């Protein structure tokens, strides 16, 4: 047997905070060494933090990374352990995203990333160059300060692996695993048995299985030990890096770290037998044949042994059941951990939420409640960093600290019901009930006086006073009156957030939380600069459909039973007067359902459908219930209002990224914000197709016509009804 103990980790790094990042790196190495591990893998760009963005273009960022690495190598941190450290490196005129492989106070080699992530939220090609020289390793001259301190002038640089006496180890960096021809396939044929994947991978609902399947698939047919490390937490932007460090052996997960956690450092250890890798490879004929004619990959020889022989005191790690969270748990824990990092790192003393008693703001309140529960649980487990942060934020003194989530919420969470003459007693009651269940400090504010003052000023200036639609007013008057209420709520929210701590003799300031969902952003069903305008928004990238399922789950699992009643209530903005024959409803106002909006959103973003492609595909999805002409009207109606309201996305509050069809304007969904909302060419093409059908409908087999399967598209213009979403 060749027994090998390896360690990987989740680290809660913060972009550009070299001091705290180094503290976490050192803690993870110390824990790995204490457990007897001889390999330690850290996350991608762990020294600087993955999310530095344009700070990567600054020479200071690279210089400081080298200074931090020098500090590690001058100490005993790398003694008797191979450490993979992620940091940017400049070679010549190019900047590379690198894993620096160190051992015994020396740099063994530097492995630059070859395939960069450049889609979705990723933009690595803006800051880094992909390494394309695969033939052989080059010599890299270390910076003068580093070479003098380490007494090491140069190191191998490029694509290759480390050949120890008893095994071979190589790095594979994040996106490379998901490329069409991943490096681990070629490296395995060259005899590499241990793969180290340093990653900066962010959370997205229902995404984890894709990642884990890739790890397992990498070693299922080729054999090997696959180590994965990731950041965990908010490192300064809309993304939450969701950890889940893991170790996979021959396709089986033998260790898995948490996906959501408040901890700064989490190290997982595994004891593996490399002979099991050799045995599997020797049993696969095709592997043997391909290995015999492999393309040779360069290596660096290290005269050192990593493994131990048969030893009954060393227990092998066994395959474990993979832990997956439900989407409802992901909505609870991901944004809760993200908000905790934002709160403790911003210097704020708490949150303020305009709580209307509706589904969206109640979801945000529940997530804050979940955050408070997680804080108390982590303190009970003995996490001193969480305890110190909670004591500062909650203004605890005399040895006290949070032991009850409701008591902690009372210290850090204000909720405000900003009612008007258009608000119902039901939403007012539900708002107060939920706040009490969470433990928030709740206020009930009537905004009628403020709205009336604004209207009086308008009447003084113009000589006219607008009326609601139900009172005979025009659409322009009706919309203007609704927007006044919404915008006054934003002004009051920020005023209360800045002054309530002063009123209650508390230090600091409060962050205002927004509560618009992804579907409302897509449709533009929100007032520009209303309560959707806040400091941060934990649900801005989550669909209404998912939020309603979350509310049902949270009513029981978070202990907030009023959420069940809130979920069952029809969504309403309560910005128009309630009459016996009229009550404002969101879906009526929008002219489409939230379920339809989810479909439009997925087709527009995930499957890259323009108006014509969306129409064609929806003819298949909705063909049993709607005629092509009816589908055409729905598609045109959506694109009309999407384009009219697109400008609102440019100023929307920074939101937690959770959904693959988010219309978030900062990076994920880059589009113009001035459209011809009539879409004359595209809508004309749709009309021509409808006319050419002569009233025909889509022909479905009987079993498909009666089924309720998902949308039948794989890409724009696919037109394939058998392809499921």
From Swiss-Prot:
What keywords tag this UniProt record?
ATP-binding, Ligase, NAD, Nucleotide-binding
Enzyme Commission identifier(s):
6.3.5.1
Full protein name: Glutamine-dependent NAD(+) synthetase
Give the UniProt family note. Answer: In the C-terminal section; belongs to the NAD synthetase family.
Q: Name one GO molecular function term.
A: glutaminase activity
Q: Where is this region: Ligase?
A: 324-709
First-level EC class: ligase
The record's listing under InterPro entries reads: C-N_Hydrolase, C-N_Hydrolase_sf, Gln-dep_NAD_synthase, NAD/GMP_synthase, NAD_synthase, Rossmann-like_a/b/a_fold
Q: Cite the annotated pathway.
A: Cofactor biosynthesis; NAD(+) biosynthesis; NAD(+) from deamido-NAD(+) (L-Gln route): step 1/1
Reactions this protein catalyses? deamido-NAD(+) + L-glutamine + ATP + H2O = L-glutamate + AMP + diphosphate + NAD(+) + H(+)
What GO terms in the biological process aspect are recorded for it? NAD biosynthetic process
The record's section on CDD domains has:
GAT_Gln-NAD-synth, NAD_synthase
Q: Where is the CN hydrolase domain?
A: 4-274
UniProt: ATP binding residues: 354-361
Q: Which PANTHER family does the UniProt record give? A: GLUTAMINE-DEPENDENT NAD(+) SYNTHETASE, NH 3 /GLUTAMINE-DEPENDENT NAD + SYNTHETASE
Q: Where is the active site?
A: 44 (proton acceptor), 113 (for glutaminase activity), 174 (nucleophile), 356
Q: Name one GO cellular component term.
A: cytoplasm
